[in-house]
Regions:
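Glycine/proline-enriched, intrinsically flexible loops and inter-domain linkers
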Residues: 1-175
């Protein structure tokens, strides 16, 4: 009963070995050199170690593309969206289109309730991305702590999410 990504077949052809995260079947690693993209469990060296090592080294030295679509995604809109996010987030949230801010939301005792990224889509219009594992919790926490005057929408299943990481990521994005 897992959900498939819109480009599932392309990932499969690229050698993806799939696992489940947040209701989605998503790539966990990619097989190298025509190996089978399947887990071979062992108490010894795992068959996927070389693939993950390759991906990690490439990302650290170059650029890596990661499938993050199961991550939770929300939109908040309204006249006071920026001020509400400023109030409930630990970082300074910029109300500037295109700006993204990594931040947390705390509880009354100062403990971390949510670990997320806030992106300004338009004036007083924000997208929030958080972990797939904490979707229900984060959604409830945000709704509980923002004004009911704001428009809140869970858009997790509406959008894909790709992460581009590494020292050459800005060069790739600028092309």
């Amino acid at each position: 009963n897992q959900r498939l990504l819109p480009y599932h077949e392309e990932l499969k052809k690229a050698g993806a070995c799939f696992g489940v995260s947040g209701e989605y079947e998503r790539p966990m690693w990619y097989a190298l050199n025509n190996e089978k993209p399947e887990y071979e469990y062992s108490f010894d060296y795992q068959n996927w170690y070389s693939s993950v090592e390759f991906e990690t080294k490439n990302t650290i030295t170059n650029v890596g593309l990661y499938e993050l679509s199961p991550f939770s995604k929300y939109e908040i809109k309204g006249e006071i969206a920026h001020s509400e996010l400023q109030r409930i987030c630990t970082a300074n949230i910029k109300n500037e289109v295109g700006r993204s801010t990594y931040t947390q939301m705390l509880n009354e005792a100062g403990g971390i309730e949510a670990d997320l990224t806030v992106i300004c889509i338009g004036e007083n219009y924000f997208r929030i991305i958080s972990s797939s594992a904490t979707r229900t919790h984060d959604k409830a926490h945000i709704i509980k702590h923002i004004s009911p005057d704001l428009e809140f929408k869970d858009i997790t299943d509406d959008l894909i999410c790709l992460g581009i990481f590494g020292p050459k990521s800005r060069n790739l994005i600028s092309k």
